[in-house]
């Protein structure tokens, strides 16, 4: 079980925490890195809404899954991962004032969902997650005309691995996305037009 915290100080930007969160909610997908897609619903990021997302994995595989908006107020919102996501847990996006400067923050509480994702975390997933949220915060800060470093901290809260949850592999979104892509490539080729029959 891990807690990861990423934050960026919006030094020099005359913007309140509430204004940062309002923009972040409205343009959430636009702040994501270019290789990831977040399909924001028309009604906005409101509690109870399920949002679809696509992320590029190593090997040019695309993971398709979703998150549910668990909570939202003027200065924060929280999403919870759907079944089959690499990590079970939630992400909280918030903004607050610190020493007269508005700070934007992403905090994750996460545990690998199955043994395959446990192995992926060691191999590459932690680094991917770090790059993703650092880039997201850089993009958010750039919207307000700020270039600043992202400070981040990773804390391991529980060293135990839940091997008893091996059955969750059945719901693994990366495996299912890969099988869907493979089936689409190897499936029967459909003609683009109906051939003309001669009599």
Please give the residue ranges for each predicted region:
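Compositionally biased, charge-rich terminal segments
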Residues: 107-112, 143-173, 199
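A conserved amphipathic terminal alpha-helix motif
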Residues: 117-157
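Hydrophobic ligand-binding cavity/cleft-lining segments
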Residues: 1-58, 169-199
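Short hydrophobic/aromatic-rich beta-strand segments that constitute the beta-sheet cores
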Residues: 53, 77-80, 104-106
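Short, surface-exposed beta-strand/loop "edge" segments at domain boundaries and coil↔beta transitions
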Residues: 15-16, 60-63, 114-117
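Beta-strand/loop substructures that line and gate deep hydrophobic ligand-binding cavities in soluble
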Residues: 83-128
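Hydrophobic-ligand binding "helix-grip"
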Residues: 58-99
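Short, intrinsically disordered, mixed-charge
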Residues: 22-30, 84, 100, 138, ...
